Amino acid sequence: MDKLRKVGLSALAGSLAMFSAHADVSLTGSGEFTYTNSGGTSDDTGNPYGLSHTISVTGTGEMDNGWSYSVFTGFAGQDLATDSNSLKITMGDMGTFSFDQGVGIAGINTLKNEVPTAYEEAGHGVSGSGNSLNGAGNTSVLGYASPSYGGLSLSLAYHPSVSSTSSQAGGTSGAGETSSNVNYAITYAPSMIEGLTLAYGSSKTEVMSAATANDDTEMTMAINYVNGALSVGYQVSEVQSGAAGANGNNVEEF
């Protein structure tokens, strides 16, 4: 038993040393002050002033085998609690592996807001669900992104247990597996039309709950064109719940 513990500690020390080589850390942040009027009298609105802020910590480096890595932690809210974190390992020409806890860096989540914006997404700061794309969430998701081949690239995401929450290393979460999800995003930037980008994404959640009749599905398609200072785009999305009697969601953005 003691021998096994020593082996585990040695392996852990080796992995930590590998990740710490040539590491750089950056700190960024932003803040937003708002005035919101709900209409009617002041009694309807209450205090119209609001403040939100975020701080992000990103660490990058190179491992002994030449692969590069990036670790990210985001803090948000008035108490600056941990909001999201992720790990990405770029394996040269073999693509990028990722582990996501709330960022949305793989699969259909990368297409949530494909239309150009001058400030924030179209649904920023308003009620409603936007296009509702989330690939059954982005907590404890395994991802893979391929290199670009002739302008064509693929991003895959696998969510082994949709009911899970973020866990520290060595931990588990979720009260037993009730559903799993696989989703992907394909983007294509043809070299013959500079500035044009086409995108397609699909998601399917295999639901094992008896209360749900069918699987949940998501689909989105987008087209964007950039020429100098001009940026135009159009995106259509469809989200369908397998729950009996549940309404679907169809959204157009431009």
Where are these regions (language model features)?
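Outer-membrane beta-barrel proteins
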Residues: M1-F254
